[in-house]
């Protein structure tokens, strides 16, 4: 599915509206609750969902846009996906984007999982194993322990370790637990992401 939206729309509001139709945005920055969709397209590159859908500039994510030229006599122009590429991640330097046509995904219930790991090489290996497993993932990210130390208490917990952040559908949780067991590491299920007061969507 697709959605046509004006660039000043907040991504958090847009996602709520899409939920009414069983859809959601494919890609989100960590600032998705307060960022505008136009700002994300003009200055962003990827984020939550990139493990699944790649980056904003990858074919299929931005379907088209409208922009006003920045010359003496401004004109409103419409661009298809290929024509939109020069304006994608151009910070508005070659035109003022006024509306976007972007691809959406089926709305799923995503569950947030944190895995504690000691060695960085092992941490990378575990994440690679998770990304190649037959599970639906929306997020797969590593935070080194030095970064974790700067995080809020609710997130970093008591163990000083590297952390893998995952968002998976309910069906993938058991597989992730089995992978953790295989590598001898612990994991913690935070819960369904959109019902959490504090979720990992705000820390990546």
Language-model features: locations:
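C-terminal substrate-recognition/cap domain of FAD-linked oxidoreductases
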Residues: 128-204
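FAD-binding subdomain of flavoenzyme oxidoreductases
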Residues: 11-12, 16-136, 140-141
């Amino acid at each position: 599915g697709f959605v046509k939206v004006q660039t000043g729309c907040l991504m958090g509001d847009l996602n709520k509206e899409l939920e009414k139709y069983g859809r959601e945005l494919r890609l989100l920055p960590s600032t998705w609750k307060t960022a505008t969709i136009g700002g994300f397209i003009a200055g962003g590159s990827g984020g939550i969902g990139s493990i699944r859908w790649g980056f904003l500039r990858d074919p299929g994510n931005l379907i088209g846009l409208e922009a006003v030229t920045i010359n003496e006599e401004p004109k409103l122009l419409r661009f298809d996906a290929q024509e939109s590429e020069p304006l994608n991640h151009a910070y508005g330097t070659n035109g003022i984007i006024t509306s976007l046509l972007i691809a959406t995904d089926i709305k799923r219930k995503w569950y947030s999982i944190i895995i504690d790991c000691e060695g960085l090489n092992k941490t990378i290996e575990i994440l690679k194993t998770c990304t190649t497993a037959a599970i639906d993932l929306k997020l797969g990210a590593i935070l080194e322990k030095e970064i974790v130390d700067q995080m809020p208490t609710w997130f970093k917990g008591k163990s000083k370790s590297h952390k893998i952040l995952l968002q998976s559908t309910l069906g993938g949780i058991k597989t992730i637990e089995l992978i953790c067991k295989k590598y001898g590491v612990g994991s913690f299920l935070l819960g369904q992401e959109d019902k959490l007061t504090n979720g990992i969507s705000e820390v990546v």
